[in-house]
A protein has these predicted regions:
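Conserved AMP-binding/adenylate-forming core of the ANL superfamily
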Residues: 17, 26, 37-89, 106-111, ...
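Conserved AMP-binding A3 loop
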Residues: 46-50, 199-223
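N-lobe entry segment of adenylate-forming
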Residues: 1-47, 51-66, 70, 115-118, ...
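Conserved AMP-binding/adenylation subdomain of ANL enzymes
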Residues: 222-239, 249-289, 303
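AMP-binding/adenylate-forming catalytic core of the ANL superfamily
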Residues: 105-115, 122-126, 290, 385, ...
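Conserved pre-ATP/AMP-binding loop-to-beta segment of ANL
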Residues: 33-36, 156-160, 165, 171, ...
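Gly/Ser/Thr-rich phosphate-binding loop
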Residues: 264, 284-292, 301-365, 378, ...
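Structural core segment of the AMP-binding/adenylate-forming
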Residues: 66, 94-178, 495-496
Length: 552
């Protein structure tokens, strides 16, 4: 029998788009001028494509009027709101680079991000939840409080010249966003802007170090958003409910640019995720699609008033960020009417999506795999020497194509570590290609446990343990062992106290003996990055430290 190797290449009869985001927006506004473009329920905003395009022009003129130029970095630090979308599209229209800042950042993370990429102008909310953004900025640069003029000169943030506040500015040194966004439009020659120009800097989640600035071009993200929509058959008739954050590629690429390229309506139910607001928005706005991570769908399904909402208009949507448990997927498809729900996988550095399940994928494919490779993307699974493995064998997943980032801003050595000489982006994920061409993610390369010479993939054990009726969430990692090199440790969030003997009994006969956790700890929460990823490095260090304390 012929062995098929783990190389994949996505094809499509639909060509790549070769245009800037600004040009695409203008096209869509001309094609669907009176179609609803943006609905932001918590702000009472409802704009057509014609209105959105005109508002983008005015804000773009305001940014140019400050003295900002093509290639300048403009940061935005705010939760989901209409202004976020305006800033995204206005900066793209005039060739500036949007720097997406996590609303959960604290002062050290914010200062690192602003300094790393040299942000010249920062657009910020006054506050969000428990964070007072303006006070946090003053903590980094105290001169902000006393500056007389609107052009700043800050010792700690030498590149930052303007801070533009959403709402009434707290101090004279801060500019008013509303005034800036009301600037009379100016003629602007956008022919100098190329689809290959950088348009966005997304910060990696930094599970193993300080976040890096993945630099993405118009070509990267406009095509990725477009093909995410193509694979779920999006059109101008679709109305997308967007509870995912805009600062992340899920919101600004997979949702916003998907809608911009298809003329679909963007509907934001709230400034941060609220399952009740999502359900209400779907019913009131007759949404046809809903995006989210699995935990969002679980929260929506678990809402006490779930059965009271009419979700019958839903057809499709995207789940990403983690594999979805089979029972949850079944409920999403049946109780939420999302028969065409799609699973997406990728990474910030690939704009982000590289794999997606198709509309005809069966249940097993949707819950066990991340689907097949995206159009115009190459992928391969390789061993430690870079040799392509046969299908069915696990190795590192590499991706190449239009979606691969330009690099990490100002960090050429980090870029070379991630993208090899052949243009392949090293994902750091362990994957295997099934015989049918669908891909399974089995873990992280750095998270792989080696016990007595056996390679153990934490994701495999996690996917098994999550089926335990009393386990809510689980994270598996390796801890040092004198004889075996490493042993398996599981941290669980459980509905009741579970001891290691009970867990081992549950596992015995159902998974290989060497995969059964030797150590178990019940916890209330896991250490997380600001983007919601589990910090296994920190968990491992805490576990080792606690074991040392317990042995004394």
């Amino acid at each position: 029998m012929t062995t098929v190797d783990s190389y994949l290449c996505g094809t499509s009869t639909t060509p790549l788009l070769h245009k800037t985001i600004g040009a695409m927006l203008a096209e869509t506004a001309a094609r669907y001028p009176d179609g609803e473009a943006l609905v932001v329920l918590h702000q009472g905003v409802r704009w057509t494509w014609r209105e959105l395009d005109a508002r983008v022009d005015r804000l773009a003129a305001g940014l140019l009027g400050l003295g900002l130029q093509r290639g300048d970095r403009v940061g935005i630090w705010a939760p989901n709101c209409a202004e976020w979308v305006l800033v995204q599209l206005a900066t793209a229209r005039v060739g500036m680079i949007l720097v997406s800042l996590n609303p959960a950042y604290r002062t050290s993370e914010l200062e690192h991000a602003l300094r790393l990429v040299g942000v010249r102008a920062l657009i910020t909310a006054e506050k969000f939840k428990s964070s007072d953004y303006i006070s946090m900025l003053a903590e980094i640069a105290p001169e902000i409080r006393g500056c007389a003029g609107s052009t700043l000169r800050l010792a700690t943030l030498p590149d930052l010249q303007w801070i533009i506040q959403l709402g009434s500015p707290r101090w004279p040194s801060l500019l008013d966003f509303e005034s800036l966004a009301a600037t009379d439009p100016v003629s602007f020659d956008d022919r100098a802007i190329s689809p290959d120009d950088p348009v966005n800097i997304q910060f990696t989640s930094g599970t193993t170090g300080a976040p890096k600035g993945a630099t993405l071009s118009h070509n990267n993200i406009i095509n990725n958003g477009f093909f995410v929509g193509e694979l779920i058959e999006f059109s101008a008739a679709d109305r997308l409910c967007i509870p995912v954050p805009l600062y992340h590629c899920f919101g600004m690429v997979m949702a916003v640019l998907n809608c911009v390229t298809h003329g679909s309506t963007m509907i934001f139910p709230s400034d941060a995720f609220d399952p009740g607001a999502v359900l209400q928005a779907v019913e009131a706005e007759r949404c046809t699609a809903l995006f989210g991570v699995p935990t969002m769908f679980i929260a929506e399904l678990s809402h006490p008033d779930f059965e009271k909402f009419d979700l019958s208009t839903l057809r499709t949507g995207v789940m990403a960020g983690a594999l979805c448990p089979e029972d949850v997927m079944t409920h999403v498809m049946e109780r939420m009417h999302m028969r065409d729900v799609s699973i997406c996988y990728g990474m910030t550095e690939t704009s982000p999506v590289s794999f997606q399940t198709r509309l005809d994928s069966d249940l097993a494919t949707r819950v066990r795999t991340v689907g097949s490779v995206h159009p115009f993307i190459e992928a391969k699974v390789v061993d430690a020497e870079g040799v392509i493995l046969p299908r069915g064998q696990a190795g590192e997943l590499l991706v190449r194509g239009y979606s691969v980032m330009r690099g990490y801003w100002g960090q050429p050595e980090k870029t070379r570590e991630a993208i090899d000489a052949g243009g392949w982006m090293h994902s750091g994920d362990l994957a295997l290609v099934q015989e049918d061409g669908n891909v399974r993610i089995v873990g992280r390369l750095k998270d792989m446990i080696i016990r007595g010479g056996e390679n153990i993939y934490p994701a495999e054990i996690e996917n098994f343990l999550i089926k335990h009726p009393d386990i809510i969430d689980v994270s598996v990692f390796g801890v040092p062992h004198e004889k075996w090199g490493e042993e398996v440790c599981a941290w669980v969030r459980a509905r009741r106290s579970i001891d290691v003997d009970e867990l081992r009994e549950y596992c015995t006969g159902r998974i290989a003996h060497f995969k059964i956790p030797t150590h178990l700890r019940c916890v209330d929460e896991f250490p997380m990055t600001v983007t919601g990823k589990v910090r296994k490095v920190e968990m491992r260090a805490l576990e080792v430290g606690m074991k040392m304390e317990e042995s004394r």
